[in-house]
Amino acid sequence: MIKSICATLLLCSFFSYSFDFKYSNKYEFVRGITECTVHFNTIIPPQFRAVVVISVAKAALESNWGKSRFARLGNNFYGMIEIDNTNPHIKALDSDIMLRKYNRKCESVADYITLLNTGTQFTEYRKVRNKQTVTQQINLDEIINSLNTFALDKDYTNKIKRTVNYLLKEYPEIFLIVKGQNV
């Protein structure tokens, strides 16, 4: 089931879903990542969906609100690493690390949702999300705490929480439209 969900996301992002967005400020960035996340959430079952505001917060943190070199040149908003140098990528400066390069911005979001559903580092996240999907009681702090394996930064989950709080305070009109998508 997970493999078919991930295949659906990838197919939609690469072939049937040509939506792209432009941004020149935080509001447009937040709106674009939100729309991509909501789109993919509507084509997969609830237990595989990403929490919209967390998806946006992580994209904001990982890409400096879309201003990072990887975001600007490769539409990579989540710091997705590429291990095969024959695939499109951008090399990190002063490092051998390569980051994935996407044709469209929403492809990065689809890849992030796929990683949430397949990555071994997100096992705890999936348990928490699935429990909350069944009970239909979303606890953002609990979900965010389960993301502590995503980054080496020990303060990462606190940064996500602060960014989520900022997003909900500064852009309530955007997140009101996604209430049915678990914020």
What are these regions (language model features)?
Residues 4-13:
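Sec-dependent N-terminal signal peptides
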Residues 16-57, 61-183:
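Catalytic cores of secreted/periplasmic lytic hydrolases that degrade extracellular macromolecules
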